[in-house]
């Protein structure tokens, strides 16, 4: 096995070690830098330790330790991961990246994309679909509301969020407190937004209480009014 090592002694001549892996990353070359690097040319695996930074196209991923496979372009960062990609800013204890698309972030995950913040113990994000999945203890905070649920699916490109299991939605700006088994939030930009609550649905606004198997909350334009029209079904 042939292993090329860049050891701490080289720090006498450079503050940061880095290698460019354009020969393996196709149209999107990867640059890896760290205090120390080990590269196995047979397996194509890079092991980086200390002040690790991976840069590819418009994404920058940092952490304490990382492994990167140049052949399948899979990366894993531990010791506090921080990803910045376009309008996404994500922090977590660890992070795995697959196929330049799937991101699996674990441990106190905080993901910010535009006006939406997603938190949970683990977030799976698919960048091509702009789809995020949180399977437990999930929270999503939008412009003027917050939703918690056992499971959350966020379709960020469509401004749509589906919460399943023990759903709780609050909005201080609109004075809403609502619960249900399932909630679907549509934050349409060019249309009236709405929230559909299903299963043991209950909504409270300004002391008014509505209950039903299904409730639809139509959200008025916040710039004009904080009114919410609730339609039982």
Question: Which positions does each model-derived feature cover?
Answer:
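Mature-chain termini and adjacent capping regions
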Residues: 1-233
């Amino acid at each position: 096995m042939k292993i090329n090592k860049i050891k701490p002694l080289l720090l006498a001549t450079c503050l940061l070690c880095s290698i460019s892996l354009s020969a393996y990353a196709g149209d999107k070359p990867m640059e890896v830098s760290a205090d120390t690097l080990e590269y196995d040319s047979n397996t194509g695996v890079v092991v980086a330790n200390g002040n690790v930074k991976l840069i590819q196209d418009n994404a920058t991923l940092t952490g304490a330790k990382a492994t990167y496979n140049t052949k399948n372009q899979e990366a894993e960062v531990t010791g506090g991961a921080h990803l910045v990609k376009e309008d996404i800013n994500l922090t977590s204890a660890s992070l795995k990246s697959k196929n330049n698309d799937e991101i699996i972030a674990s441990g106190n995950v905080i993901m910010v994309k535009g006006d939406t913040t997603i938190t949970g113990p683990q977030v799976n994000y698919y960048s091509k679909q702009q789809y995020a999945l949180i399977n437990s203890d999930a929270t999503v905070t939008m412009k003027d509301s917050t939703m918690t649920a056992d499971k959350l699916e966020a379709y960020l490109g469509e401004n749509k969020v589906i919460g399943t299991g023990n759903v709780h939605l609050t909005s201080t700006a609109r004075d809403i407190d609502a619960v249900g088994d399932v909630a679907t939030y549509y934050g349409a930009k060019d249309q009236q937004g709405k929230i559909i609550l299903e299963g043991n649905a209950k909504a409270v606004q300004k002391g008014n209480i509505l209950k039903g198997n299904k409730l639809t909350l139509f959200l008025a334009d916040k710039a004009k009014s904080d009114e919410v029209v609730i339609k039982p079904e």
